[in-house]
Regions:
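Surface-exposed extracellular loop regions of Gram-negative outer-membrane beta-barrel proteins
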Residues: 340-354, 399, 414, 418-456, ...
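Transmembrane beta-barrel wall of Gram-negative outer-membrane proteins
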Residues: 161-185, 200-237, 259-283, 317-320, ...
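Periplasmic N-terminal accessory/gating domains of Gram-negative outer-membrane beta-barrel systems
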Residues: 40-117, 122-130, 147
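Membrane-embedded beta-barrel scaffold of Gram-negative outer-membrane proteins
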Residues: 282-286, 292, 415, 422-423, ...
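C-terminal beta-signal and adjacent terminal beta-strands/loops
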Residues: 562, 571-591, 608-612, 616-677
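Gram-negative outer-membrane beta-barrel transporters
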Residues: 382-386, 475-477, 498-581, 674
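Short strand-turn segments of transmembrane beta-barrel domains in outer membranes
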Residues: 110-113, 121-132, 140-171, 181-183, ...
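Structural signature of Gram-negative outer-membrane beta-barrels, strongest in the C-terminal barrel
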Residues: 231, 320-324, 330, 363-478, ...
Length: 677
């Protein structure tokens, strides 16, 4: 009850003070103009930008996958998927928001997002120097908004492709009330059947992913909107690692059944109040239960459970001339439990060789309870008709590390000409340390939050009604990052310290054409450099996600009312990697060999390039709207190398061993089908 009281006290102060402040300002005006009407409109259609993202070729209708066609965004795991890395930051540095609420589970293990494409209303990517409404992030922010349900006769939409199938049910219930519910399930298990064996690996639990989203919304009168939400997703799979496999030959500790089972389930409620045309108040609350279980080797396992509660309060007003004021309060509460019987490896994504950081097998149970509080204010101030300034501040505190931050943030936009604007943005940021580094038994409970400072500047030019271009430069200074302590050092018991820093800098250019003459598209190019510095040795090395240049091109053409075609081309410099320059006996299994690595991230993979093409045919089946989508992934069949690894065959010696390349996805045809009843 004490925590609940503390939670609502700042909220009451925010709402009451802003209401009083706005009333006093408005009372000074001589003339009062009030627009009477329904202010709680349901937002049921996607934005134009989202529709364009959904049409990008080769993404199976997944608009979040389309963000990898934007400047400065790459997959952390190459063609194998993984979360996005933005402008030289770690994927863990990003924050994801869905309908204003923070979430961690937004991509499946194979890289596709957890959202039904028919439910997305808007996607915003803030790649750097984002505003005060976002916190607990030092990289970038993905803000995803799902659309509201449609008050219509009951409708069922079914879609299927070679990769997944799904169903969406939507319609009105009572007056001013409507709902939708979506469920999707992957079809990967049809291509990777149980019992299939290759190179000593046998599938015993074919990989499956599924997800669901649901909303029930009640428009109360003209000024209130009450929305209940359900969200969830899961991924699972299992494989047997035998002595004959490469993994088994390298490290027999992994011989046996290996499986993963991860899921999350979320329930939430949001109340929006529009008491006046200039005022909006929002209260959002949700509960998220995230669970993960990994089993491998001879009885080794790692299980985790995160019981999370989120509360967000927001008040906004435009009653003060030339100002849009926002005040908000956030509370994020975590109860994280980690159970394990495993051989730990104490390393980070900037360690040269995790094998050298191998610890002794340990069993135990660890727990982290953390409450993260934030209070923020923001003012968008129209200084002149051509000059806009945004000033914000965000105060954050967490009761685990006991750290408090005050983060100032600002931006300035100047319209030099009606079609040309210059802008600059800056801010400071922090995030809670990685859980693995903060655990008391396997990490350092005294590890501190990671910090960053962002600055960016650029220009936008509306060339014509249909053509526009944008250029931007940026710099990210990263500090207090986690550094793995050498297990042979005198302070090895610390495991991790805040002795790593880094920088990421670059320039990006985008030219975009809006729909005209039956086609639209964009071309982007970027140059960047991302480095990390060991603050103890003062050695600076390139970050493994450092991608000096990236080029993306997207185009879609409407042939007629039935046919659309599109293409996406991506090319980029290869990722950094640490080369293997030899092998050595495994100290725990002398008859087996481990790879011996050279200088950290000192080599570069070959250039990556990929062309995806797609055609969509719209028609009717017995009066019902339907569509067929034909796609060809990696149409040119480029052999994109994603890494190199030591491939033992049982006959290797230190003078005779095989290093093999790992390739990304080859030519892959796909077909999709969608029908609405």
């Amino acid at each position: 009850m004490m925590n609940q009281s503390k939670t609502f006290t700042p909220a009451c102060l925010i709402f009451s003070s802003l209401t009083l402040f706005s009333s006093l300002i408005y009372a000074d005006k001589v003339e009062k103009v009030e627009v009477v009407g329904q202010r709680n409109q349901a937002l049921t259609t996607p934005t134009l930008a989202t529709e364009k993202l959904m049409a990008v070729a080769g993404i199976d209708g997944d608009p979040l996958a389309a963000v990898f066609s934007l400047p400065g965004v790459v997959y952390a795991g190459g063609d194998d998927g993984g979360e996005p890395a933005i402008r030289g930051s770690s994927p863990n540095d990003n924050a994801f928001y869905v309908d204003m609420m923070p979430t961690d589970y937004i991509f499946h293990l194979f890289g596709d997002s957890i959202f039904n494409k028919n439910l997305l209303r808007n996607i915003e990517l803030d790649a750097a120097a984002f505003g005060s409404q976002y916190g607990n992030a030092t990289g970038g922010v993905f803000d995803v908004r799902l659309r509201d349900p449609k008050a219509q006769p009951l409708e069922v939409k079914f879609n299927a492709s070679l990769l997944k199938t799904g169903i969406l049910v939507e319609g009105g219930t009572f007056e001013q009330q409507a709902f939708y519910f979506s469920y999707r399930r992957s079809l990967i298990h049809l291509f990777l059947a149980e019992g299939d064996e290759e190179d000593g690996l046998t599938i015993f639990d074919a990989p499956v992913s599924d997800d669901y989203q649901g909303k029930y919304q009640w428009l109360i009168g003209n000024n209130h909107k009450l929305t209940f939400t359900l969200n969830g997703a899961s991924d699972s799979g299992g494989i047997n690692i035998s002595e004959a496999s490469e993994e088994g030959r390298i490290d027999p500790d992994f011989i046996g059944d290996a499986s993963i089972d991860a899921r999350f389930d979320s329930q939430g409620v949001q109340w929006e109040w529009f008491p006046h045309q200039d005022d909006t108040y929002t209260v959002s609350f949700n509960h998220v239960l995230s669970e993960s279980s990994e089993k491998y080797g001879a009885g080794q396992f790692e299980t985790s459970e995160d019981n999370e509660f989120n509360l967000r309060l927001l008040a906004q007003t435009t009653r003060l001339n030339q100002h849009k004021l926002s005040l908000g309060f956030d509370l994020q509460s975590h109860d994280f439990t980690y159970s394990f019987d495993a051989i730990p490896y104490f390393c980070t994504d900037h360690s040269a060789n995790c094998d050298e950081q191998k610890g002794e097998r340990i069993q135990g149970k660890d727990n982290i309870k953390a409450n993260i509080y934030a209070l923020y204010a923001n003012d968008v101030w129209q200084l002149t008709p051509s000059l806009t300034m945004e000033l914000g501040v965000r105060t954050e505190h967490d009761d685990y590390t006991k750290k408090t931050f005050v983060h100032p943030r600002a931006s300035l936009t100047w319209y030099v000409l009606p079609q040309v604007s210059l802008f600059t943005k800056t801010g400071t940021y922090s995030r809670f340390p990685d859980v693995g580094a903060a655990l008391s038994m396997l990490g350092n409970p005294k590890i501190q939050p990671y910090e960053a400072r962002h600055i960016s500047a650029g220009a936008e030019w509306q060339i014509t009604d249909h053509w526009q271009t944008k250029a931007e430069i940026y710099l990210k200074d990263l500090s207090q990052l986690a550094r793995a302590v050498d297990i042979d050092s005198d302070n090895a018991e610390l495991r991790y310290t805040n002795d790593l820093s880094g920088t990421a800098k670059g320039i990006e250019w985008l030219i975009e054409k809006e729909l005209s003459n039956n086609w639209y598209g964009w071309l982007s190019a970027s140059w960047s450099k991302s480095e990390r510095t060991d603050d103890l040795t003062q050695i600076t090395t390139e970050y493994y996600l450092d991608t000096p240049w990236i080029v993306n091109a997207v185009a879609n053409y409407k042939i007629n009312e039935r046919w659309d075609i599109g293409l996406r081309y991506s090319a980029r410099s290869g990722a950094k990697y640490t080369p293997i320059n030899g092998i050595k006996p495994n100290p725990d299994f002398p008859d087996n060999y481990l790879a011996q690595y050279g200088e950290l991230n000192s080599d570069t993979l070959p250039t990556y390039s990929r062309l995806d093409i797609q055609a969509k045919f719209q028609y009717q089946i017995f009066g019902n709207e339907a569509a067929l989508t034909f796609a060809l992934i990696n149409a040119l069949g480029n052999e994109n190398i994603s890494g190199y690894y030591f491939k033992p065959d049982g006959n290797e010696t230190p003078d005779n061993f095989d290093i093999t390349s790992e390739e990304g996805v080859g030519i892959f045809p796909s077909i999709g089908f969608e029908v609405t009843f």
